[in-house]
Curated annotation (Swiss-Prot):
Entry function: Implicated in the defense of plants against pathogens.
Pfam families to which the protein is assigned, alphabetical: Glyco_hydro_17
Position of the signal peptide: 1-32
Subcellular location: Vacuole
Residues at the catalytic site: E128 (proton donor), E273 (nucleophile)
Keyword Hydrolase: yes
Organism: Nicotiana plumbaginifolia
UniProt KW keywords: Glycoprotein, Glycosidase, Hydrolase, Plant defense, Signal, Vacuole
Family: Belongs to the glycosyl hydrolase 17 family.
Catalytic activity, EC: 3.2.1.39
Molecular function GO terms recorded: glucan endo-1,3-beta-D-glucosidase activity
GO terms classed as biological process: carbohydrate metabolic process; defense response
Residue positions with a glycan: N356
Protein name per UniProt: Glucan endo-1,3-beta-glucosidase, basic vacuolar isoform
């Protein structure tokens, strides 16, 4: 005891405070870095690409999802240090699957020509392609397209930098309750299992679009609004030793369980879309959207009962997009087209601010 008291000097107190600040800073930065925002462009009144990227930077949004390799956006991203999930659109999947020469051309034109000035982290080959939706005509081409892009990325010398995956939705899940019993639909296993095997072998995550809003609005009699908005005061689902207070976690963990049942226990998940509309349909209100988004950003730092670690999550979307249909789809934006924020959201303080703060403390020690 006396030894400890002997070293309890103002200098040691300052060092201790510095350590606590650094820990707090690392937690805040980790939480902020867990969140990205999807940059959709289906509007006729949106800011230009340079303005958009400056808005990302000014709001400390460190990750961005592009749905296609728009060269104007990629040019604006140069030197921004923003990590990018780059989409290969559904319209290109069949072409890319047909031959390596097409994959090499796509990677050269849309990836290598911008690397390393643009920090491309993932290639999302296709979005929500599924044998049980209107995209079923593309299902046989998806895994071959992913393989070809993966090979082309490797040939370009970027295999250690960029992961190749695809973005799926919850229609592929056959059972999601309780979360530990999650499994893919039996009639989709022929499609899903090769994707899971590819991701396992290449150590890439599955990209999953998770929307508690659609589950709630489609079944409000059985799914409560607080459970959907992260505001339930008590445990809603007890699944063995795991307790679920929000639908987002339950949906996410059901996909983890489904991956495990398909041989993908080692495959991670990135939430490639999640959001809540502010108008346009049942349950789509400003207050609900504000509550969901604020709580999602906070919750992404914490993880789910099955995987209690930060969840890399991309919010849909940056702007309200007036060319989208149906009406509901026009109201998912975090910002209005005039760049004014719709909600008071905190994406975390920038590392430079925290570095300056800790630097001044160090100078006083």
């Amino acid at each position: 005891m006396s030894t400890l008291h002997k070293h309890n000097t103002p200098q040691m107190a300052a060092i201790t405070l510095l350590g606590l600040l650094l820990v707090a800073s690392s937690i805040e930065i980790a939480g902020a870095e867990s969140i990205g925002v999807c940059y959709g462009m289906l509007g006729n009144n949106l800011p230009n690409h340079w303005e958009v990227i400056q808005l990302y930077k000014s709001r400390n949004i460190g990750r961005l999802r592009l749905y296609d390799p728009n060269h104007g956006a990629l040019q604006a991203l140069k030197g921004s240090n923003i990590e990018v999930m780059l989409g290969l659109p559904n319209s290109d999947v069949k072409h890319i699957a047909s031959g390596m020469e097409h994959a090499r051309w796509w990677v050269q034109k849309n990836v290598k020509d911008f690397w390393p000035d643009v920090k491309i982290k993932y290639i999302a080959v296709g979005n929500e392609i599924s044998p049980v939706t209107g995209t079923s005509y593309l299902t046989s081409f998806l895994t071959p397209a992913m393989v070809n892009i993966y090979k082309a990325i490797g040939e370009a010398g970027l295999g250690n930098n960029i992961k190749v995956s695809t973005s799926v939705d919850m229609t592929l899940i056959g059972n999601s309750y309780p979360p530990s019993q999650g499994s893919f639909r039996n009639d989709a296993r022929w499609f899903v299992d090769p994707i899971v095997g590819f991701l396992r072998d290449t150590r890439a995550p599955l990209l999953v679009n998770i929307y508690p809003y659609f589950s709630y609005s489609g079944n409000p009699g059985q799914i409560s609004l607080p459970y959907s908005l992260f505001t339930a005061p008590n445990v809603v689902v007890q699944d063995g030793s795991r307790q679920y207070r929000n639908l987002f976690d339950a949906m996410l963990d059901s996909v983890y369980a489904a991956l495990e049942r398909s041989g993908g226990a080692s495959v991670g998940i990135v939430v490639s879309e999640s959001g809540w509309p502010s108008a346009g349909a049942f349950g789509a209100t400003y207050d609900n959207a504000a509550t969901y988004l604020k709580n999602l950003i906070q919750h992404a730092k914490e993880g789910s009962p099955r995987k209690p670690r930060p969840i890399e999550t991309y919010i849909f979307a940056m702007f309200d997009e007036n060319n989208k249909n149906p009406e509901l789809e026009k109201h998912f934006g975090l910002f209005s087209p005039n760049k004014q924020p719709k909600y008071n959201l905190n994406f975390g303080v920038s590392g430079s601010v925290e570095t300056n703060a800790t630097a001044s403390l160090i100078s006083e020690i």
